[in-house]
């Protein structure tokens, strides 16, 4: 993703006095001051006593049980996956539109800096942001506005840590603004990176390097990323968030990130207080906020404001929809004879369902893609399953004994979620949670289980049957899903990740082990 060094020299061969000249592109970029106070409040409460350069807290001591989405036993981020290098900063891109993008920088030093940027095809047209002072572990939210649609931009982060210190310049990074209808593009998907005892940081970086090689316009991560619910206290997981910024920052300086919540990410209302996790996620990871480009949740919540938990947008010929089944599920699962309602308590909630219905019914996109950590309800108490789970609960409308009680439990809703997706031409539902690759088909919809990007072993698929997967193409982790969208057809590939020690004549890193196509909706 890094462009030739000769282009970097255009940005960085400047004098010290020129680092912070009068801003000539004031109207084309701004620092998002409105969200900055919330971001500053979202730092780790233990940060003052535990801060290190690079922000990591080492070790993996664990006491007690792990347990579901509730509070678990971690006291520190598990080693070795969370033992990431120190660094002066990391950068994540988010919220790309036809005319803007958000750059979220997390510095680990004090100083002052600026973003310089220009269209790829006219590198001499350099603009820059206002000078920005920064403090260690206080996120910077920089929004570049007034950009050209359907354009690749290059940018660099230039900074000083003292007035007499040399100017530091990042590598040259890039991003692309919204593609128009008819243009081809690539995006990628991963899920369940975990960074727990079964995770390998080496494999994860290998996967992310493979993602970068695909040169996607953006990347979606389908949750179980921060594992907040596995810690004794939510704030103990802060180092986990920083580790993910290190890993995802290895590519997301040039690949905008969209995050979809998972059951372990600390924002399941039924599992207790979500305030710390929501504020921390919002401070460190810039998800879409509803505006003229993005549709989404417009109901503010407590001290957080916009939740940025479900959202939709258009890119080229495709509609993208990200869903959240955790914020509005307010009851915990009951087991055995106390579980009188099955999994009907799992829900998108009225507002999210009505929003989903409207987004689907008003879209004329050729492709419609839905992203969710697991199906709403699933097939069992742990919400496992693909198409075998699709007939049940809010997703499919039936109890596990086959009786249809949808209108009993959802009297204000038109139809179950799966039927809504079928009638509105959704081609693929991307879901995670179950930790392997599975491509299944049901009534014209592909249910694509997304593999882990970071599993520590070259795995097997024995858990597929245990989790209720009885059909389809099933393969083990690790790897990522690559989607190449064009107006005529969309190709979906499973790109495998192998460390050198695991490669042989039959498997090489970045091999494509399975591919299929989906066709556009006919008008």
Regions found by a protein language model. Give the residues of each.
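Extended active-site neighborhood of metal-dependent phosphoesterases/phosphodiesterases
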Residues: 144, 152-174, 233-364, 383-408, ...
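Acidic, histidine-bearing metal-coordination/catalytic regions of metal-dependent phosphoesterases
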Residues: 25-189, 212-213, 476-477, 482-523
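Bacterial N-terminal signal peptides
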Residues: 9-18
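Loop/turn elements at helix/coil->beta-strand transitions in domains of secreted/extracellular proteins
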Residues: 183-186, 214-221, 252-258, 315-320, ...
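Conserved, compact domain cores that house catalytic/ligand-binding motifs in diverse enzymes
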Residues: 185-260, 265
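Bacterial N-terminal signal peptides that target proteins for export
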Residues: 1-10
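Active-site neighborhood of phospho(di)ester-bond hydrolases with catalytic His/Asp-centered motifs
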Residues: 189-191, 219-224, 257-263, 369-373, ...
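Short acidic, glycine-rich surface-loop motifs adjacent to enzyme active sites
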Residues: 222-229, 363-381
């Amino acid at each position: 993703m890094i462009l030739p060094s000769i282009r970097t020299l255009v940005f960085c061969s400047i004098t010290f006095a020129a680092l912070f000249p009068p801003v000539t592109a004031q109207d084309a970029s701004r620092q998002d001051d409105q969200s900055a106070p919330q971001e500053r409040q979202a730092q780790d409460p233990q940060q003052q006593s535990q801060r290190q350069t690079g922000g990591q807290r080492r070790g993996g001591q664990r006491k007690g049980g792990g347990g579901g989405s509730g509070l678990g036993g971690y006291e520190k981020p598990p080693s070795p996956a969370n033992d990431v290098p120190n660094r002066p900063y990391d950068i994540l891109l988010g919220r790309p539109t036809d005319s803007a993008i958000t750059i979220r920088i997390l510095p680990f030093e004090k100083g002052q800096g600026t973003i310089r940027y220009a269209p790829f095809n006219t590198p001499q047209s350099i603009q820059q942001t206002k000078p920005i002072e920064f403090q260690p572990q206080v996120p910077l939210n920089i929004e570049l506005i007034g950009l050209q649609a359907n354009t690749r931009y290059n940018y660099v982060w230039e900074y000083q840590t003292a007035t007499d210190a040399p100017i530091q310049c990042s590598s040259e990074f890039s991003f692309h603004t919204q593609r128009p209808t008819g243009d081809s593009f690539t995006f990628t998907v991963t899920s369940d990176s975990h960074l727990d005892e079964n995770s390998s940081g080496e494999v994860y970086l290998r996967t992310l390097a493979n993602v970068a090689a695909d040169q996607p316009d953006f990347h979606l991560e389908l949750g179980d990323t921060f594992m907040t619910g596995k810690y004794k206290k939510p704030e103990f997981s802060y180092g986990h968030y920083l580790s993910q910024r290190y890993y995802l920052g290895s590519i997301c300086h040039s690949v905008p990130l969209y995050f979809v919540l998972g059951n372990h990410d600390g924002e399941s209302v039924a599992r207790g207080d979500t305030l710390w996790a929501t504020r921390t996620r919002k401070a460190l990871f810039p998800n879409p906020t509803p505006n003229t480009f993005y549709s989404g949740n417009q109901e503010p919540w407590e001290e957080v404001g916009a939740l940025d938990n479900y959202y939709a947008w258009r890119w080229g010929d495709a509609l993208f929809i990200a869903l959240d089944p955790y914020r509005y599920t307010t009851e915990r699962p009951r087991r055995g004879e106390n579980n009188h309602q099955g999994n009907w308590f799992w829900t998108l909630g009225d507002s999210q369902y009505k929003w989903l219905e409207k987004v689907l019914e008003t879209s004329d996109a050729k492709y419609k893609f839905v992203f969710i950590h697991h199906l709403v309800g699933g097939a069992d108490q742990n919400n496992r399953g693909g198409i075998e789970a699709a007939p049940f609960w809010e997703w499919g409308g039936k109890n596990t004994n086959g009786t249809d009680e949808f209108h009993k439990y959802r009297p204000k809703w038109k139809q179950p979620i799966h039927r809504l997706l079928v009638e509105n031409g959704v081609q693929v539902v991307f879901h995670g949670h179950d930790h392997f690759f599975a491509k299944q088909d049901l009534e014209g919809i592909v249910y694509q289980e997304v593999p882990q990007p970071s599993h520590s072993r070259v795995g097997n698929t024995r858990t597929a049957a245990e989790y209720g997967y009885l059909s389809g193409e099933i393969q083990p982790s690790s790897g990522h899903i690559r989607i190449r969208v064009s107006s005529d057809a969309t190709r979906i590939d499973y790109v495998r990740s192998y460390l050198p020690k695991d490669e042989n004549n039959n498997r090489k890193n970045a091999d494509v082990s399975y591919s299929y196509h989906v066709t556009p909706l006919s008008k």
